[in-house]
C-alpha cells in the first residue's frame, strides 16, 4: 500500500477524446444542457435551495482560468448567463467552493500567479444577481490552496492548506463576523513539521468544526477541532481515528449536537472505510468501526445523514482492473451498519461516487461500462434496502466525469464536465420522473484506466493501490 507523504497540490484531470455533447435523453431526466460558455470548463459544483439552483466552475482560455457562476430561478430548466467572478487578467483561478443561504452567496477559490498562490472570495447578497469585487483571505506570505467555506448567520468561515518554508503543510482558518465584508487575521490551526491536509469545514449556530488529515505523529490520523464561540477560539484537536494504520480523506457532517465522520484506513493491511460519531458536540468520539469489511481496497468515501440514517458510499477494488461502487447504511444513528451492497456491479470500472438524500437516497458515479466514461445514477426509495437499476445520464460521445449532485424535494440536480482534454463543457440535468433503465448495460472493453479517476482525490496523501 503506497502512502505518499506529501500533500499533492496539483489536480490530475482525466483526458478524453474528441468533442462531446449529450446525445440521448436519459429516462426520468431532462436532456443534458450546456451551462458553460466558450473555453475549457471544469470542476463544477452545484447547490439547490428554495432560492434557486446555483452552479460554479472554472473556465480556461488564452492561458488563464477564471471562476464562473450561474443560477437558475425556474427549477433548473434555464440558467442565466455565466458571470466571471475572478476576472483575472492572468493566472489560474482554481478549485472553487461555495455556499448559499437566504440568497447570500459566497464563493472562494485559489489564485495561482507568478509562483504565488492566494485564497480569494467573492460574495453576493442578492442571490447571485450581482457580486462584489473579490477580496483576498490569505496573507500571501506562503502558498495557499484548496479553500473551504461555511456560513452561519452573519459569520463566514474559511479554511485552506498553507505550504510553509520547510515544505510542510498546515491548516489555516479565517472568519468574518460582518457577512464577509472583512476578515480577521488568519489563524494557524496546525504548526506541524509534517503535513496536514484535506480541511473539512462545518458550522452549526455558534459551533464551528474543522477536520483534517495529519501525519505529525508519524502516521496519518484524522483530527477535529471545534469552536464554541463562532471561531474566536478553538479547542485542542481530537484524534478521531485512533488507529494504528494510515487514515485519510475525511468527510464530516454536523447535525445539531451530533458529529459524524468517515474516512479510509489501512490498519487491516487493505484500505477500509471507517466511521465514528460524537453525540456531545465533538468533545468525545466513539471508537471507530470498520463498515466495509471487504476484500481489496475500499477508498474515497462519501456520505450523507437523513434523520437517524447514515448512508455511506465508496469506491471498492474488485480486481486489478475493475472497481465498483459500494453502499452501507445505518438505521440507528450509526450504532451499527448493515452489510455493504454493490450498487454498480458491472463489467467496467466504476468510481468517484457522490451521494445525497432528501428522504430518498441518490448515488451517482463515473462508469466506463457503456464504452467510455459516463455519469450513472441510482435511487432508493426504501431507506437503502434496495436500489433501482442505474440510469446513464450523460450518453455523451466522449468522456463525462467530475459529477456533482444536489437533492431537494424529490428532485435531483446534476452537473458534470464532458469533452476532450482542453475542450470541456459543463452540463446540467435534473430528474423528472426518475424512471430507471432496465436491462444490463453492455459489456465493453475498458478505454481509460480507473487510475485516472482515483488520482482525482488530489488533496489527499493516501492513494489506493492501482
Q: Can you say where each PLM-predicted feature lies in the sequence?
A:
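Secretory targeting signatures
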Residues: 1-25, 173, 261, 275, ...
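Extracellular, repeat-based ectodomains that mediate carbohydrate processing or recognition
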Residues: 22-436
Amino acid at each position: 500500500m503506497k502512502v505518499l507523504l506529501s500533500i499533492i497540490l496539483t489536480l490530475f484531470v482525466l483526458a478524453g477524446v474528441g468533442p462531446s455533447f449529450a446525445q440521448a435523453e436519459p429516462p426520468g431526466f431532462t436532456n443534458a444542457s450546456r451551462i458553460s460558455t466558450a473555453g475549457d470548463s471544469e470542476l463544477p459544483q452545484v447547490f439547490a435551495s428554495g432560492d434557486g439552483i446555483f452552479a460554479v466552475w472554472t473556465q480556461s482560455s488564452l492561458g488563464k482560468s477564471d471562476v464562473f457562476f450561474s443560477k437558475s430561478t425556474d427549477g433548473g430548466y434555464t440558467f442565466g448567463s455565466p458571470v466571471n467572478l475572478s476576472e483575472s487578467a492572468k493566472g489560474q483561478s482554481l478549485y472553487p467552493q461555495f455556499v448559499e443561504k437566504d440568497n447570500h452567496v459566497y464563493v472562494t477559490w485559489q489564485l495561482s500567479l507568478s509562483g504565488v498562490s492566494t485564497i480569494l472570495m467573492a460574495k453576493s447578497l442578492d442571490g447571485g444577481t450581482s457580486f462584489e469585487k473579490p477580496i483576498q483571505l490569505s496573507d500571501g506570505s506562503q502558498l495557499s490552496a484548496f479553500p473551504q467555506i461555511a456560513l452561519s448567520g452573519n459569520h463566514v468561515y474559511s479554511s485552506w492548506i498553507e505550504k510553509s518554508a520547510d515544505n510542510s503543510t498546515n491548516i489555516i482558518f479565517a472568519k468574518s463576523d460582518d457577512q464577509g465584508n472583512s476578515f480577521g487575521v488568519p489563524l494557524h490551526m496546525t504548526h506541524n513539521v509534517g503535513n496536514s491536509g484535506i480541511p473539512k469545514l462545518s458550522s452549526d449556530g455558534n459551533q464551528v468544526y474543522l477536520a483534517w488529515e495529519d501525519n505529525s505523529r508519524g502516521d496519518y490520523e484524522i483530527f477535529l477541532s471545534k469552536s464554541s464561540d463562532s471561531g474566536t477560539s478553538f479547542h485542542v484537536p481530537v484524534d478521531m481515528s485512533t488507529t494504528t494504520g494510515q487514515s485519510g480523506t475525511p468527510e464530516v457532517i454536523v447535525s445539531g449536537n451530533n458529529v459524524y465522520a468517515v474516512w479510509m484506513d489501512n490498519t487491516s493491511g487493505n484500505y477500509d472505510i471507517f466511521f465514528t460519531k460524537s453525540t456531545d458536540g465533538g468533545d468525545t468520539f466513539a471508537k471507530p468501526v470498520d463498515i466495509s469489511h471487504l476484500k481489496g481496497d475500499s477508498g474515497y468515501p462519501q456520505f450523507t445523514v437523513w434523520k437517524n440514517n447514515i448512508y455511506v458510499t465508496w469506491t471498492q477494488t474488485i480486481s486489478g482492473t475493475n472497481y465498483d461502487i459500494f453502499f452501507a447504511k445505518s438505521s440507528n444513528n450509526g450504532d451499527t451498519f448493515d452489510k455493504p451492497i454493490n450498487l454498480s456491479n458491472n463489467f467496467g470500472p466504476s468510481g468517484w461516487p457522490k451521494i445525497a438524500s432528501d428522504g430518498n437516497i441518490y448515488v451517482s458515479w463515473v462508469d466506463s461500462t457503456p464504452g467510455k466514461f459516463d455519469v450513472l445514477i441510482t435511487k432508493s426509495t426504501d431507506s437503502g434496502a434496495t436500489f433501482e437499476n442505474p440510469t446513464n445520464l450523460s450518453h455523451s460521445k466522449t468522456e463525462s466525469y467530475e459529477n456533482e449532485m444536489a437533492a431537494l424535494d424529490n428532485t435531483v440536480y446534476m452537473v458534470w464536465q464532458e469533452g476532450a482534454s482542453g475542450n470541456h463543457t459543463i452540463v446540467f440535468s435534473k430528474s423528472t420522473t426518475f424512471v430507471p433503465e432496465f436491462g444490463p448495460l453492455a459489456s465493453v472493453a475498458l478505454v481509460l484506466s480507473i487510475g485516472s479517476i482515483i488520482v482525482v482525490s488530489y488533496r489527499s496523501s493516501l492513494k489506493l493501490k492501482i
